[in-house]
Amino acid sequence: MKQENLTQECCSTSPKISKGLMVLQSIASRGCDTQDSEKKPQSTQQSLKKSSQAAAGYFYDKEDQIRKLSKHNGFLSEMEDMRKAFLMRPGCPQFSTRTTSMSHVGSAIMVDLPRTCSGVWKLTEDHPLGRLGSASSVDGRVFPFSKSACELNYPRKRSEPSDPSPTGSPTVVKKSQRTRTPWYISVIHEKDHSLLLMGEELQRFSEMESQMQKKDQEILTLQKEKEALKKQLKNLLRGKGTETSSASIKMDRSFETPLKLGRMSVLKTIYKEEDELQHWMQMQEEYSMAESSKELHVEPGSAIEEKSSEGPPEEAAAAKLSRPSQSKTETLLEVGPEEEEEEEEEEVEGDEAKGTEEGEILVNEEEASWELREDEECHPKRSYSMTESFEEELMAQLEEYERMLMDFQRELEFTRSRYSLATGTITSLQRQTDFQESQLRKVTTENELLEKELRERKQQIQDMTDKFSNLREEKKHQEIMGLIEKENLVLRQQVADLKMDLISSERTIKELNTQTKELEDQVNTDKDHLRRWKDLHDDLQTRNEIIQQTEQQTRVVLEATQARYEKLRNKIIQAVFSVSGNKNLSMELSDSYILESLQRIISERSDFYSQLKQKGVKVPPLQQSDVSLPSKIKKMASK
């Protein structure tokens, strides 16, 4: 139930993922069939390297462990199995979920994945050169390879030695079990290979971007050409009026120049004829004056009237000839700028105006010729010869004007034909611009489609890379978490040991601190004792010196007392021997006897001394030794 709920949630949240899963299942079924048919001949032909064998055995064991662990994982286990089947199919495009036709971009070339993996990452081997464009199924049908984004223009890696499946040889499995390489080496190789593939993919995308930039430049050039053609069309559409106006102006100018020349020639001839007429009239006047003098009534000023009558018709004819030409030029000059500003309808009106102007010119010329004829008829008969020659010249000029009109008509027809040709070229240019616009639209649509495909391919690549990276990262995360937990336990034990060591070291430090304090106290006491001993020593030295001094003094006193004692002894001996009642020398004298005698002497002396004092005789005082001597003698006697 949980698996069904997970699949339903995934399908409802991401329809693209569900479609991709369906495609993966179909491709996996195709890949498994083709792989079983190709496994036996490939396993006998190829051999494993030591590192690949070790990695294959390790990952084979890991696969069994993962299968045991992922039996009850539901949707994740299904995704893992489908990913394995997807990677095991022949001609696997690594980062695509759907098959798209890219025949217009380039031929499909296989992308090789690393072959050192176990059944989880195991792929089919390289196909021979004849099978680069198709993959055959079990039935013998030829499947076209999926020309996805990652298969375009990749160089085929034929130098890599292909490895058979690890189940092919049991000795290889034993060797791989003995020498197992760490799991991260194959992961690093796989990452390097995927990075290389991504680099090639980026190079291909950069080439496609350069192609897109070139196409954008071509589109810009086509747009510029289109704008230039539009400008040419506008100029041509505007130039219709300008060409017709310029052609009419040229025609008018070419028409006006012979008119002006003819007018000038007519005027010159008129002026010459007027001079000749004046000269002839003067001659006639002189002749008439001569005749009038001969004859009776000659009217004065007849010549002047004839001159005036002949002159004005000629001037009128010239004016009449000049007026239509001036009116024509004025109308043409008026029509010209109007035709420049207006478009095709105004051009048609300009052509009609030209026809009306030409008709007016012809009518004016005919009227001028009739007026000249009438004027000539009005002339007197005597100027008939001159007017006849003048009429002939005018007729010749009229014939020239008719010829010029015919030429102008021909030129008009020529300009009409040119106008029709110009309209034809304009229509052809319009068709060309339409064709180029259609090509531009096609190119823009193709570019948009290519950009959409590029975006889709990039999104597909990103989705597949995210899927595979998430799946791989989950496994790696679990393994890393286990390693981290083990390392944490080891670190905790180490921390506990270090704490115990710390406690013991702290205890020893405390003991040592107490010992150092005691030793410091002892040192201080010893220092005090030493100081006291030094003081005592100094005192003793001073006392010793004092004692030595006193000893010397006592020695001196002793020697003096000894000397005095000797003297006293001698005196005592003399006194003893001289005292009455002395005994014989043959008898020995005892100490008591000597003491008694001494006391007697001393007492007598002291009595004598006191008597002398009583009498008032100045006597020196007795010495202390003399006074203290009987007490000492008593002490000695008591001892």
From Swiss-Prot:
It comes from the Eukaryota. The keyword Coiled coil applies. InterPro entries: CC-FHA_domain (IPR052642). It comes from Mus musculus (Mouse). Residues 154-176, 291-385 are annotated as: Disordered. Residues 336-350, 358-369 have a biased composition (Acidic residues). This is Coiled-coil domain-containing protein 27. Residues 203-242 form a coiled coil. Residues 310-320 have a biased composition (Low complexity). Keywords: Coiled coil. The keyword Coiled coil applies. Residues 292-309, 370-380 have a biased composition (Basic and acidic residues).
